Amino acid sequence: MIDKSAFIHPTAIVEDGAVIGANVHIGPFCIVGPQVEIGEGTVLKSHVVVNGQTKIGRDNEIYQFASIGEVNQDLKYAGEPTRVEIGDRNRIRESVTIHRGTVQGGGLTKVGSDNLLMINAHVAHDCTVGNRCILANNATLAGHVSVDDFAIIGGMTAVHQFCIIGAHVMVGGCSGVAQDVPPYVIAQGNHATPFGVNIEGLKRRGFSREGLVAIRNAYKLLYRSGKTLDEAKLEIAELAEKHPEVKAFTEFFERSTRGPIR
């Protein structure tokens, strides 16, 4: 179904069965598959390919040569009906690739809302990207990676399978992330190691002075106290009872399977 207000360039191909919302703009030489749903106001600039079971929300801007919903690169994939979901108001720049999920990983690759995926960024199968994240040029997420809200991943950075990038994290460019990065942390290097708290980013997002002090104290317990990881977790949990900002650390520890960067 194609809304009558949608614009489809004469050179674009929109296959029967696709659902195209109001005021969608599909530019020259785009290809939209039969199981694709594109929400109101989304723009496909030109030469964009969207296929598979892919649902795109409203008011996204998708630039030339982006590929969304293509078959993933997991060698176990055997053509199962897996999906991609993308939220609203994302900017997906040139040559970005977002692959469909796998049955083993839950069958869904998901990108939230208000994100910026810069040129040539790659989101592999079964990844979850939250809201208001930035993946800089050539940033690469391997399969099953989780990127939490407000995280920034620098250019040319690669993130290992199953890693977690916590909320408000900043990962420097040209890094290799092989373990989980706790929330609020600055990480850099190959393999990435912690370099303090992302204080400037947190200030811009309105964190209170008291909250910033509590986050710094949690960071010091984890990385500067000389305590074991289990000891640090216990003291951070006590700190979280008084300071809600620190709960992000305890929730991170519950999810972490690869262990925090050290």
Curated annotation (Swiss-Prot):
Cell division in keyword set: no
Claim: Acetylation is one of the keywords in the record: no
Stored InterPro entries: Acetyltransf_C, Acetyltransf_C_sf, Hexapep, Hexapep_transf_CS, Lipid_A_LpxA, Trimer_LpxA-like_sf
Cellular compartments per GO CC: cytoplasm; membrane
CDD domains for the chain: LbH_UDP-GlcNAc_AT (cd03351)
UniProt pathway: Glycolipid biosynthesis; lipid IV(A) biosynthesis; lipid IV(A) from (3R)-3-hydroxytetradecanoyl-[acyl-carrier-protein] and UDP-N-acetyl-alpha-D-glucosamine: step 1/6
EC number(s) on file: 2.3.1.129
Subcellular location: Cytoplasm
Catalytically driven reaction(s): a (3R)-hydroxyacyl-[ACP] + UDP-N-acetyl-alpha-D-glucosamine = a UDP-3-O-[(3R)-3-hydroxyacyl]-N-acetyl-alpha-D-glucosamine + holo-[ACP]
Key words of the record: Acyltransferase, Cytoplasm, Lipid A biosynthesis, Lipid biosynthesis, Lipid metabolism, Repeat, Transferase
UniProt GO molecular function: acyl-[acyl-carrier-protein]-UDP-N-acetylglucosamine O-acyltransferase activity
GO biological process terms on file: lipid A biosynthetic process
Superkingdom: Bacteria
Subunit: Homotrimer.
Its job: Involved in the biosynthesis of lipid A, a phosphorylated glycolipid that anchors the lipopolysaccharide to the outer membrane of the cell.
HAMAP family associated with the record: LpxA
Family as reported in the entry's similarity comment: Belongs to the transferase hexapeptide repeat family. LpxA subfamily.
Cross-referenced PANTHER family: ACYL-[ACYL-CARRIER-PROTEIN]--UDP-N-ACETYLGLUCOSAMINE O-ACYLTRANSFERASE, ACYL-[ACYL-CARRIER-PROTEIN]--UDP-N-ACETYLGLUCOSAMINE O-ACYLTRANSFERASE, MITOCHONDRIAL-RELATED
Protein name as annotated: Acyl-[acyl-carrier-protein]--UDP-N-acetylglucosamine O-acyltransferase
Gene transcribed to yield this protein: lpxA
